[in-house]
Amino acid sequence: MKQPDRNQQQGAKSNRPAINDEIRSKEVRLVGADGEQKGIVSLNEALRAAEEVELDLVEIVANAEPPVCKIMDYNKHLFDLKQKQKDAKKKQHQVQVKEIKLRPATDVGDYQVKLRAILKFLEEGNKVKITLRFRGREMAHQQLGLAQLQKIEADVTEYGVVEQAPKMEGRQMGMLLGPKKKK
């Protein structure tokens, strides 16, 4: 059975439901440990029924008339709630934007390494920002950079879609890829 928390101040209101002796109503609508409706009984009867099966009497709906109370193991109930929250948190995937930086003169071997990284990021469900930096006289050959970004776009069509078309931003050209929606 739930033991009173020694660290909790007496009379302090918390967001947890009333348990056992904390219930202030004279009569309660009792729900058994198996979920079966027991009807309206006195608080003492409900507490006795909970003690017989060595479980807690927990006030489920406090503002009902009379309040609805259920016989359950409160600590196990809290544990199950925390487990559900953890599982829900694990299932969530935070989409991140990963950045890959290239130059217009990037060689074939280096291009393949960057392409593998892009595909890995897209398979993980992340977005990929591809930045192509131009230095010095490379600015005169922006069409080479655009051709390289279009080649990347063609190579990743199976895994991702272009969310932002290639565009110049100062001395660099950028493009944003997003993962393809799974069916």
From Swiss-Prot:
Coiled coil: none
Example GO BP: ribosome disassembly
Residues making up the signal peptide according to the UniProt record: none
Polar residues bias: start-end ranges: 1-13
Annotated spans, Disordered: 1-24
Keyword Lyase listed: no
Keyword annotations of the record: Cytoplasm, Initiation factor, Protein biosynthesis
Locations listed in the record: Cytoplasm
Gene3D superfamilies, per database record: Translation initiation factor 3 (IF-3), C-terminal domain, Translation initiation factor 3 (IF-3), N-terminal domain
GO terms of molecular function: ribosome binding; translation initiation factor activity
One Pfam match: IF3_N
Keyword Aminoacyl-tRNA synthetase: no
Record's GO cellular component terms: cytosol; membrane
Function as written in the Swiss-Prot or TrEMBL entry: IF-3 binds to the 30S ribosomal subunit and shifts the equilibrium between 70S ribosomes and their 50S and 30S subunits in favor of the free subunits, thus enhancing the availability of 30S subunits on which protein synthesis initiation begins.
SUBUNIT field: Monomer.
PANTHER family: TRANSLATION INITIATION FACTOR IF-3, TRANSLATION INITIATION FACTOR IF-3, MITOCHONDRIAL
NCBIfam families attached to this UniProt entry: infC
Family in the record: Belongs to the IF-3 family.
Protein name, UniProt field: Translation initiation factor IF-3
Annotated source species: Acinetobacter baylyi (strain ATCC 33305 / BD413 / ADP1)
